[in-house]
Amino acid sequence: MLTRVDTPRDQLLKLLVQHSFQHSAEPVFTLASGRKSRYYINCKATTFMAEAMPLLGRLFFERIKTREQKDGEQIAAVGGLTLGADPIAYAVAYHSALHGTPIQAFSVRKEPKGHGAQKWVEGFEQPGARVVIIEDVVTTGASTLKAIDGALHAGFQIVTVLALVDRQEGGREELQRKGHEIEAIYTTEDLMRVVRRQGD
């Protein structure tokens, strides 16, 4: 009998459930927005793990390559709001270099630098470049919009937003309402599906 081998997507999902996810029957977790939720997702507990880095790099790189093929144009760089997007952007940059098609990384500050050039963005800088905004988890969309604003200040052309987890709490709809495309590797429902399966 053949045993099913976990795909990279399965492997990363299991790491997220194990290290980054808590859930409750009642909304007991307070989010950054002040709202209460049944779910607590701290993606950084997974994205900073050595075991997760190759999986993150591969999964996001594959999504970006699919987008490039669709548009017929290359993506120059990936990045998002520090700190959540940073390890994902670095993983993508490293993976892309290994495959001979480098995609650069950048990091968007939460506030512009208070001295010197007062920059919003560190790392890759090329006005007009096509970039993908990376997000670890999308809830209301507020932090993603802040990252987009910083990237626009740097002169980037935003192609799409690519998130690790969509909490399915209105963030996707808010970004779309503002005219931004978004896709996610996982949703909260994907994480809960693993939890339910483990409980069987």
What is the meaning of each model-derived region?
Residues 2-18, 149-200:
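PRPP-dependent phosphoribosyltransferase catalytic core
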Residues 78-79, 106, 159, 183:
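Structural detector of well-ordered beta-strand residues that form the stable sheet scaffold
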Residues 89-132, 142-145, 198-199:
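Short, glycine/charge-rich flexible loops or terminal/linker lids adjacent to PRPP-binding catalytic cores
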Residues 1-70:
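Active-site-facing substrate-recognition patch
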Residues 71-84, 160-162:
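Short glycine-rich phosphate-binding loop at a beta-alpha junction
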Residues 68, 96, 155:
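Active-site catalytic pocket residues across diverse enzymes, especially alpha/beta-hydrolases
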Residues 80-84, 109, 138-139:
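Active-site nucleophile and cofactor-binding loops and adjacent substrate-binding regions
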Residues 137-148, 170-171:
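Acidic, divalent-metal-coordinating active-site segment for phosphoryl/phosphodiester hydrolysis
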